[in-house]
Amino acid sequence: FTQSMYYLAKSLDDRPVIVNDGWEHTSCDVITIHNYTQDADVLFDNCKDLTKSSEKSIKAAKKPVFVRGFKYNGQPIIVSEYGGCCMNKDVNKGWGYGLGADGEEDFLSRYDKLRKALKKLKFLSGYCYTQFNDVQQEKNGIADEDGNMKVNLEKLKKINV
């Protein structure tokens, strides 16, 4: 099915097509990975061999990057979802990935370590933190549902520069 949709989309538009964001890729123009581990070393280890293996397992998501019979063919690779840490104060209101952060400093420390782990992967074309703001039961945003920041924006900016 995804291959049919890929070729249909390509026949209508020549822009890049992603058939299944995060895992179990078939034919596609960009490889996207979801990995929600809170451990920077585990994140690095899970991603470091993505260009070498056709069926590398994403340990945090427990799903393979490629469907059996498909492999990496030089496409750009993006970690399109990583992180997903919630604050401990929000745990009873919903969920996030892993253990909740004990406050702003703990959250920023995790965020920084995860980002640095991804920066070491020179083959990555990009990465995107999950997620900007809370959505319903998902309390893993850097802002709440109303857009109020949970962390100091200047501190977050310093980490990203």
Locate each region found by the language model.
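Substrate-binding/catalytic cleft of secreted carbohydrate-active enzymes
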Residues: F1-G147
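Catalytic cores of secreted or luminal carbohydrate-active enzymes
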Residues: G141-V161
